[in-house]
Amino acid sequence: MALLLKNAHVVDPSVELDGAVDVLIDGDKIAEVGENLVAEGAEVRDLSGKYLVPGLVDMHVHLREPGYEVKEDIESGTRAAAKGGFTGVCAMPNTDPVTDNGTVVEFVKSRAAEVGHCRVYPSGAMTRGLKGEAMSEMGDMVARGAVAFTDDGRGVQGAGMLRRCMDYGKMFGKVFMSHCQDEDLVGHGQINEGKVSTRLALEGWPAAGEELQIARDIEIAKLTGAKLHIQHISTAHGLELVRAGKAAGVQVTCEATPHHMFLTENDLDETYNTSLKVNPPLRTDEDAEAIRQGVIDGTVDAIVTDHAPHTPWEKAREFELAPFGMIGLETSLSLVLTELVNTGKMSVSRMVELMAIKPREILGLDQVQVKAGSVADLTVFDPSATWTVGEDGYESRAENSGFAGRTLTGRATDVFVGGKQTLADGCIC
């Protein structure tokens, strides 16, 4: 049965839409967009007071399957994604076995098709086993559906190995996503190196440990002509390096997370809250402000979550022994609405670019547009819905949110993936 969505405020900068129109969905496609639509026999849904936008895509998510299903699996991770308003996620390859060959890529895709609540786009490892010693089977992975290459979780430590990966892999036209961490310099760093790490007697994670590899990777991208994407950028100087690389004509993009925009090392002070232990670490107030400005001015290309679920008992360990990472799929949209859109610092149109259009562009995916003939991957949100993070639990298997207890304004209410509703009135279908 066709579905007519009426009275939503539709925002899609790619087709210059920003106003109240109706959207008719028939099967997996948008059949018609216009004012005062009438469709005989269609189910009618009134979306007054809500926004409808192209489906959001999170291009940095850890679904943990295969191998770490005790933390998260594809079913629970995509359920969390749908709850947060996402129609698609890019899955990182640090699984067990590592996604470094076509067989694992096929498993992720088939499992997502079987149990997923949104689309799953697998990324493939640059190197075998994420060890940085030998190139992975890039061609085989692309043939089976990999959309990008990354050793996320570690990063490629050897400059020569990264160059070889880029020189060879660029023929496939995929982006290389770089986790920038100089392991020798960072050592066993736990939180940002500075006053807070000194007060808490925790080993510091220097900003230079990230910035050195950002600079290196930009130079290697320039040398090879490969497409480079800097993951979870967290420092002001790192952002300047990306800005300079873009100005020099290097094919470089970058992403930022809500936790690096809206939390700082000061939130850790005297708390030892392991949910705030992330990689790269929460930085200074100045760094967070620079990242926010980069998101607004266009230097940052995409907002991602780096959704990293862990079991409660892992995060309950001593700070030095607890794993890095926090969950974010269910809070990302709401945080951006609360902190940037509802405060007037950023438009809904810019948010759509950061969370829907640019992620698809960087990953080489087909764009979704609110126009007739486009695939009906759509996100609907209520900008005035107020809720408290964690109050009603999580769809994710994990609970390690750094924003637990925070009251947010704005939340996804409905999600459509290929015309099929996966979130209805805030409930998973």
Which residues does each predicted region cover?
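Alpha-helix-loop-beta-strand connector modules within alpha/beta enzyme cores
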Residues: 102-119, 167-178, 335
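Divalent metal-coordination and catalytic microenvironments
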Residues: 8, 23, 28, 49, ...
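N-terminal metal-binding scaffold of metallo-dependent hydrolase/deaminase domains
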Residues: 1-39
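Active-site metal-binding motif and surrounding structural segment of the metallo-beta-lactamase
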Residues: 36-53
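His/Asp/Glu-enriched, well-ordered alpha-helical/loop segment
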Residues: 199-227, 294-297, 301-303, 308-383
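Metal-associated gating/positioning segment near the N- to mid-region
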Residues: 48-112
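C-terminal cap of metal-dependent C-N hydrolases
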Residues: 318-321, 375-427
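Histidine/acidic residue-rich metal-binding segments in metalloenzymes
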Residues: 135-303
